[in-house]
Amino acid sequence: MKIKQLPAIFEPARPVLQKIEEAGYEAYFVGGCVRDTILHDEIHDIDIATSAYPSEIKAIFNHTVDTGIEHGTVMILDHGTGYETTTFRTESGYQDYRRPDKVTFVRSLSEDLQRRDFTINALALREDGEVIDLFDGLEDLQKHLIKAVGNPNERFHEDALRMMRAVRFASKLDFVIDTATLKGIKENAPLLEKIAVERIRVELEKLLLGQNPVAGLKDFIATGLYQYCPGLENAQAALSALLILNQWHLENEAQLWSVLGLQLQLDQKEIGKFLKKWKTANDLIAQVKKVVPAVQAIRQRALTPTLMFNTGETALHDANQVAKLYGWAIDDEELQKAYQKLPIKNAKELAIDGRVLITKAGVKPGPLMGKILQQLTLAVVNGEIANNATVLLEKVEEITKEG
């Protein structure tokens, strides 16, 4: 197969391949960029594989950086752009089910491609557009099939994360996992415990944000992979309930983790514990803790000014997107109008602050000041008093007399 017109992203890198070839070596675009070119999907970055050893690449190009030279990776700097090239290699001795104990540089493209995960990712592309397909990856692309290169058990023992990549690709590409490959995942699922949770999280997030999350989730459940993920060990019923939902339009991590929080029926404290097991960022945890109650309020049509104020515009949007998945959402425009009606959108918009309380009302810094500002804020949000400095100071006088 020959691609007549390569996507524009390849053009600046073509002279790099040509220069390597002129020096007597082979060089190809490889991996996901080739797959996505054939599928007419967006290409995010390009990978180059070559028969030239790192020392030979450094001899060909004047400007290089050793980004992973022990694994054969050298970055070529060309006209201000960096291109990572990796020498053809074989790998052996995967004691941690993730990284090889030994890497051997080779001159054979075939040896390099046969260590890759799936046939659709084991394609190579010449700079002139000729596709090299040694493992029937083109046929599997046509069949929309995710199939391990060679023996699935060997591929998953080399890198157990490949099992999560398989179910993620099922969602991302809306493909089906090959029978033998699926069987291999079921048999090797316990190996997922050997993988760092951060890496598993990335794959799960991509799965739930993919083109067909239901397809990926179905395989995630059927293979038993979920049993080796933090907090999901006994979640088959909760996860399976997601398979009947068809309005999947999740946009970001906050939304997808909120869905899982809802499915697992987690309270605020449990949400924090669950997400910490997945080693998510603290700001994501805070966002999910806002989104989940807002989804429940949307479902019950109980969105109050206080809840909208505390949730904030971004989390409200996220909550309504999650609610759409369940068929609970309210009209986006209606939600936006309700939010915009709030007299203030954050505490900084209050007409007085701590300094005014000190100078005009004689309130000293401390817990009382915080309590007063909170009461004033909620009173303004709920339309009980106007956001006016004079009115607010009168209210302060009332509060201090009561207190």
Curated annotation (Swiss-Prot):
E.C. designation(s): 2.7.7.72
UniProt-annotated binding residues for Mg(2+): D45, D47
The keyword Nucleotidyltransferase is assigned to this record: yes
Cofactor (UniProt): Mg(2+)
Binding positions (CTP): G32, R35, R116, D159, R162, R165, R168
Enzyme class: transferase
The keyword Nucleotidyltransferase is assigned to this record: yes
Reactions this protein catalyses: a tRNA precursor + 2 CTP + ATP = a tRNA with a 3' CCA end + 3 diphosphate; a tRNA with a 3' CCA end + 2 CTP + ATP = a tRNA with a 3' CCACCA end + 3 diphosphate
Example GO BP: tRNA 3'-terminal CCA addition
InterPro entries named in the record: Bact_CCA-adding_enz_type3_sf, CCA-adding_enz_C, CCA-adding_enz_firmicutes, NT_sf, PolA_pol_head_dom, PolyA_RNA-bd
Pfam families reported in the protein's UniProt record: PolyA_pol (PF01743), PolyA_pol_RNAbd (PF12627), tRNA_NucTran2_2 (PF13735)
Residues engaged in binding ATP: G32, R35, R116, D159, R162, R165, R168
MF GO annotations: ATP binding; CCA tRNA nucleotidyltransferase activity; magnesium ion binding; tRNA binding
Domain of life of the source: Bacteria
Quaternary structure annotation from Swiss-Prot or TrEMBL: Homodimer.
Homology family: Belongs to the tRNA nucleotidyltransferase/poly(A) polymerase family. Bacterial CCA-adding enzyme type 3 subfamily.
Note: A single active site specifically recognizes both ATP and CTP and is responsible for their addition.
Cited function: Catalyzes the addition and repair of the essential 3'-terminal CCA sequence in tRNAs without using a nucleic acid template. Adds these three nucleotides in the order of C, C, and A to the tRNA nucleotide-73, using CTP and ATP as substrates and producing inorganic pyrophosphate. tRNA 3'-terminal CCA addition is required both for tRNA processing and repair. Also involved in tRNA surveillance by mediating tandem CCA addition to generate a CCACCA at the 3' terminus of unstable tRNAs. While stable tRNAs receive only 3'-terminal CCA, unstable tRNAs are marked with CCACCA and rapidly degraded.
HAMAP family linked: CCA_bact_type3
Protein name: CCA-adding enzyme
